[in-house]
Every structure is written in C-alpha cells, then in structure tokens.
Amino acid sequence: MPRRLANLTLLAAITTLLASGILAWLLPASAAGALYIVHRVAGVGLVLSLVWKYRVARRSLRRRGVGGSGVWVGLAAAGLTIVAAGLGLAWTVGLVSFDRPFAYSALNLHVIAGLALAGIVVAHVLMRGESRPALVTFAGRRAALRGLALLAASFVATAALDRIALARRDSGSRHAGSFTGNVFPVTIWSLDTVPNIAVESWRLRVSGSTSAAPVELAYSDLATLPRREASVVLDCTGGWWTEQRWSGFSLSDLLARCGMSEAATRVEVISVTGHRWTFDRSEAEQALLATHVGGEPLSAGHGYPLRLVAPSLRGFLWIKWVGEVIAA
C-alpha cells in the first residue's frame, strides 16, 4: 500500500473510532447499537492497517533516522495506537476485566489512550501534512480494491472475534451481577472522590428560570414525594453492567412539587462534587432520583443520599451525590 494511502487509511480509522466511541457514550442505548458495530469494525481495520504502516515507518526510519520532533511525535502516536488497540482487543477476548487494582479499568485506559491519541494525531498531521497529491489520486481502481479488501477483512475478523468473545452487551460491558442491593462495583467519575456527606445538613436545592422561588429540601422531606420503583440497567463506561431495583421519586414529580415543571425544557443535575449533566425534557421525564437500591439505602460509594437513575443512558450520566437540580 502506498505511503500516503496507508496514512489516510489510518487517519480515517482513528477518526471513525473517536467519533463512534464518543457518540455511543452520549446517545441512548437504542440509538447507539450501530455505532458499537462501526467501532469494532474500525478497530479491527486499524490493527490490520498497522501492518502496512509498519512497513512504511520502517523504511522512513532507515532513511531519516530518529532525529527531528516529527519523528518523535509519530512514534508517540504509534505507541498510543498500540496501547489503545491492544487494550480494546484484550478486552474483547477476555484477557482483561473490569476488576482492577486501581481507579480505572482496562476499558477506561483504552478510552484515555484513544483520547490522547487524537491530540497526538492532530499534531502529527500538522507537522507532517502534505498537500499533494490530491485525494482524487487515491480514487483509482487499485486503491479502491485495496480499501474494499481491508473493509471486508475487517468485517470477517470482527465476526470471528465476536464468536470467541466473552458474553457482553453491545457496549462491550460485562455482567457484574444483578439484584444484589449495594453489592456491585463502585465507579467514580473522573478524579472525584467519595464525599463525606452529613445527611442532617445535606439539602437538595431546586431552582430554575421560572417564576417559582428556589426550594431547598432536607432528606426527610424527600419522603413526602410520591414513591417510585423501577428495575433499570446501569451500563458503566468502566466495562460492566448490572440491573438493580431502584427506588426513590421521579425527577418530574420533584419539579412539579417545586412549581417548575411546566416551562422546563432542560434539566441540569449537579453533584456535590461538581459533576453535572444537562438532560432534555424527554430524558428528564424518564429519570428517577433514587435513595435506595434493592431495598437498601444507597451506600456512600453508590451515591448516598441521592443519585440519578437515567434509563438507557450510560453510567457516567447517572449523577451521584445529587445536591442541586436546575430547570430551564
């Protein structure tokens, strides 16, 4: 494969992986299914493309040596590509698990390496970018056949990997047990730590852009809201999933109680740690603010005294330790 065609193939694969990975995180599960397939196929295509890239890079290093910042940026990109792709494949075939001795699982590290790779690739393209030949040069019959062969091989290899992979959801997450109360993995978003919350002084603040004045509710006040229960799957981006019986009150009931439901089109839920997310009206109407799981009060690691349960959305959007809700 010509050098520039190999580079463009790698760039296309990495771009596809980043776009499909990020969008699949943000979209509801019902809309993300095709993106998971695209992500797996692009990942296999990336690994296959590395064979051609290795030949190109070896010739280039023999000719130019390792001097120059562009070469080192390229080597950094190669290293991150190997780490991200290696962790992804290891996860698929079950060589690594979501159980980990430190804060992030192998799947988390796969994501971190992929995001770091994006920045390195941009720098590499800017430093080594070439304007000639134009892309139309690669539209010939030979290039098209090579591209189709790579795509076909990627689909075949992906199907083969899926046959030997451990049981998992479309997202790649593995089962971590269900209906176990608080006995399921504890995952902390980003660099958050589990806060020490004194429930006696904790307050849930509800405010918005309506005429209603802000409201603060104590933990004991939550018992006056209509009680809701639901069995919902929590699919964590750390690579595991669990189905639990959550109980609490609906976000819609809370807003109605505080006089802020009619005009709200977006609802922002904020943790005492600062982690926050804004949900549209349809998502907010499905959400539950849970105080219990499996009949047990939430443990500190699982969000006590209050956490969001957001059906069909990934776990990093299930805000823990909720301290404020803003309707807009």
Briefly describe each language-model feature range.
Residues M1-F184, T193, V206:
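Membrane-embedded alpha-helical bundles that constitute the cytochrome b-like, heme-associated redox core
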Residues A160-A328:
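Structured, non-membrane catalytic/scaffold regions adjacent to prosthetic-group chemistry
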